[in-house]
């Protein structure tokens, strides 16, 4: 059984026991979080939401909070002496999917 959930402005396909990296959540490591924006549930009994599946939830356990690898953002305009270099590290939350309730 799998589900498509909406979190952090993205849609993610998840299965039970899977570990996924999502946009940062306000939860500490070891806590349990519930996703209620379930858009689709697949498997033996398929359910499609309009826009979400009523009564469907996905439960996950927060493994850790972290920050992704650093990327360099560079802005440049020729002949204008404009150079701007900036780094960015996106925060993320690592979660393990425990149960899909449909």
Swiss-Prot record:
Q: Which UniProt keywords apply?
A: Ribonucleoprotein, Ribosomal protein, RNA-binding, rRNA-binding
Q: List the HAMAP family hit by this protein, alphabetically.
A: Ribosomal_bL21
Provide the coiled-coil residue spans: none
Q: Name one GO cellular component term.
A: cytoplasm
Q: Does the keyword RNA-binding apply?
A: yes
**One GO term (biological process):** translation
Spell out the subunit comment: Part of the 50S ribosomal subunit. Contacts protein L20.
Q: Name one Pfam family in it.
A: Ribosomal_L21p
SUPFAM superfamilies from the UniProt entry? L21p-like
Record flagged with keyword Ribosomal protein:
yes
Spell out the molecular function terms from Gene Ontology.
rRNA binding; structural constituent of ribosome
Similarity annotation: Belongs to the bacterial ribosomal protein bL21 family.
Name assigned to this protein: Large ribosomal subunit protein bL21
NCBIfam families, per the entry:
L21
Q: What does this protein do?
A: This protein binds to 23S rRNA in the presence of protein L20.
């Amino acid at each position: 059984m799998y589900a498509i959930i909406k979190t952090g402005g993205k849609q993610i396909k998840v299965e039970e026991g899977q570990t996924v990296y999502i946009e940062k959540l306000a939860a500490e490591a070891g806590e349990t979080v519930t996703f209620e924006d379930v858009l689709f549930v697949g498997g033996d009994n398929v359910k499609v939401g309009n826009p979400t599946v009523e009564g469907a939830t996905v439960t996950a356990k927060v493994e850790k909070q972290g920050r992704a690898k650093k990327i360099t953002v560079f802005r440049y305009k020729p002949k204008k002496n404009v150079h701007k270099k900036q780094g960015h590290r996106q925060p993320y939350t690592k979660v393990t999917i425990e149960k899909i309730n449909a």
